[in-house]
Amino acid sequence: MKKILVALTLLASALTSHAQERRVQNRPYTDLRDFHFGVLVGTHLQDLELNNVGPQMVDLGDGNGMVQKIVSADQDRWDAGFTVGVLGELRINSTFQLRMAPAMYFGTRHLTFRNITDLNAQGEPTEQVQDLKTAYVSCAFDLIAAAPRFNNHRPYVILGLNPMLNLSGKSNDYIKLKHSDVFLEVGLGCDFYLPYFKLRPELKFMYSLINSLDKNHSKNLQDKNMLMYTNSVNETRAKMIALTFYFE
């Protein structure tokens, strides 16, 4: 037993020494540039938090006046999308960098509305669905705090703000979002120094800082039967989990 423990200890020591062994650095001066550009591609999962109002009084325009309806709205899954863009990065010092990354986020959110007041033949709430397409033009401003480089990798964390313009939205949708939004970004990543470029995989979490619901949308609806679904929500906040690859 003692021989096995000694062998395992020696093996662990050898592996640790090998992991900490200095190697030839690829692109050793790449982080000394005052400013540089790059491109980015990635994928993301997006969700929409919806605050339901509960019972509501609506006029369906059928001559029966105001009637009470209860409709719940939910995005019951995380929907995938993709991201493309460019970046410019300013070196502040050996630890901090400031990055500006104009990009476009494309995706679709699957929303489900359940009318609890009007039941179907099976006694279940009737449902309506909406595929809320999203196309955002963004320009993220991130502060990067990086650890010292070791061999050909360098971990880091980020914190930033990402203002976005929403280019999507239809007049006949149940839910419509505002044309602008602002996201808080928190994430982590690691620089990998390859022979010809630096690869930076990054995972970040994004949360909307404002209510992104277009509350004036209900005034433009032509079909009054849609009102109960549109008015079932009084607040929405978007959130994303993004995996991005930067090539610099």
Model-derived regions: residue spans:
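Short glycine/proline- and aromatic-enriched beta-strand/turn motifs that initiate or cap beta-hairpins
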Residues: 20-81, 240, 246-248
